[in-house]
């Protein structure tokens, strides 16, 4: 029995190595191939990460001055959600990375972003103590176009790290326009 487990483990490792060779993991910020398949980000880009710190908007989590409760955007246009948190400053590199993740099929970025959510959100997770993690649903038409729902993949990664369950309780019946189309940003 023991030797069959070893053979299975060896086969599994060989299969993962083959997949790494065929589809190498890439850095989510610079998109270069990572030397080590266990890395989630290259060392150069790891030093460039800029986590959000200090006072934040109570609504969206963007950095604000110490005496402000809400950022300019949330003061002008309250969103349809109660509270959100970003973990990194949304600069050009982060915007490019998220665009590659969502629209160009870079599903492997889920491991990096899930782990980053866990590491940089540990304090908030300790306060919230979630029992389940529910991803934001994606309309089936958008999911067909993208091939996956990034919120679902992030929820799975985060729930594994938190040892919580990830449930899919909702489905989106009505398609909506991307935020960039609503605001004219992009």
Each model region followed by its residue ranges:
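Glycine-rich phosphate/pyrophosphate-handling loop used in enzymes and phosphotransfer proteins
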Residues: 1-186
């Amino acid at each position: 029995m023991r030797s069959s487990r070893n053979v299975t483990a060896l086969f599994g490792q060989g299969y993962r190595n083959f997949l790494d060779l065929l589809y190498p993991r890439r850095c989510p910020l610079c998109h270069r191939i990572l030397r080590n398949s266990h890395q989630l980000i290259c060392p150069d880009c790891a030093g460039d990460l800029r986590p959000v710190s200090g006072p934040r908007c109570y609504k969206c989590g963007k950095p604000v001055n110490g005496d402000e409760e809400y950022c300019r955007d949330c003061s002008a246009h309250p969103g349809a959600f109660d509270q959100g948190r970003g973990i990194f400053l949304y600069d050009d590199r982060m915007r490019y990375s998220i665009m590659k993740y969502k629209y160009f099929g870079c599903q492997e970025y889920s491991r990096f972003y899930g782990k980053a959510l866990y590491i940089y959100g540990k304090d908030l997770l300790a306060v919230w103590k979630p029992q389940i993690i529910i991803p934001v649903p994606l309309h089936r038409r958008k999911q067909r176009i993208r091939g996956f729902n990034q919120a679902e993949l992030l929820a799975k990664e985060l729930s594994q790290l938190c040892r919580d369950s990830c449930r899919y309780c909702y489905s989106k019946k009505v398609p909506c326009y991307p935020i960039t189309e609503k605001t004219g940003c992009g």
